A protein has these predicted regions:
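N-terminal targeting leaders that direct proteins to extracytoplasmic destinations
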Residues: 2-84
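Sterically constrained small-residue positions within well-ordered secondary structures
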Residues: 13, 84-86, 120, 161, ...
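Extracytoplasmic
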Residues: 72, 86-92, 105, 112, ...
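Surface-exposed acidic loop/strand-edge motifs in secreted or periplasmic proteins
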Residues: 76, 80, 90, 97
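Periplasmic peptidoglycan-binding/anchoring modules of Gram-negative envelope and division proteins
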Residues: 95-130, 155-159, 194-200
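Periplasmic OmpA-like peptidoglycan-binding domain that tethers envelope proteins to the cell wall
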Residues: 132-200
Length: 200
């Protein structure tokens, strides 16, 4: 807890004296706009998107889960997010090499994320926090590292912004879901993705 408070103090300093560390284009308001459900008058589970009752039940079964999510569940989550067109944002979150320790230059981005998730528009939603690596290294190692990094982001949000941990599902995908499949080792594949799991 103390470590997370230190992160927040560092973030305040970085935002004031070193704005070059932050992604100036990605404000907390911009994150809210990306993650807020669209208000549409369409049937849930229609071709245009939305969660079916079965998909919602699956997501609900993962909330507050003590054990690690298994391969089949990860695959199903990916399928649900894509089929339902759930609101998503990709973030660059920097960690120590070969580690799940959040670097100081990543803190401003996580502060903006925390402000967004605790805002009035999003505070009742549930979110998937997924960690991704590039294709360098052994698959098993990448999987464990991505799980640990997603867990670090979740801990930051819970510790600093009092986001209900039951509203956050942290999952590691390793190199299973590359952002740029044409270049498996590209830096853009190393990312954290946040998805709003409330049906739009």
């Amino acid at each position: 807890m103390r470590k997370l408070s230190v992160y927040l103090a560092v973030a305040t300093t970085l935002l004031v004296v070193a704005p070059s560390f932050a992604d100036d284009a990605l404000t907390s308001d911009a994150i809210i706009l990306k993650l807020a459900p669209a208000h549409k008058t369409r049937a849930v589970g229609s071709a245009s998107g939305g969660l079916t009752a079965e998909q919602q039940a699956f997501i609900d079964s993962l909330k507050g889960r003590k054990r690690q999510i298994v391969v089949e569940e990860r695959t199903e989550l990916t399928k649900v997010v894509k089929e339902a067109h759930l609101p998503t944002v990709d973030l660059e979150v920097y960690f120590d090499f070969d580690s799940s320790v959040i670097l100081p230059r990543a803190v401003p981005t996580l502060v903006k994320l925390g402000q967004a998730l605790s805002s009035d528009r999003l505070k009742t939603s549930s979110f998937l926090i997924s960690g991704h690596t590039d294709a360098k290294g052994a698959p098993g190692y990448n999987q464990r590292l991505s799980e640990a990094r997603a867990g670090s982001v979740k801990a930051f949000l819970v510790g600093n912004f009092h986001v209900d941990p039951r509203q956050l599902i942290s999952v590691g995908y390793g190199a299973e879901d590359l952002k740029d499949p044409s270049d498996p080792e590209a830096a853009e594949n190393r990312r954290v993705t946040v998805v709003n799991l409330v049906a739009p």
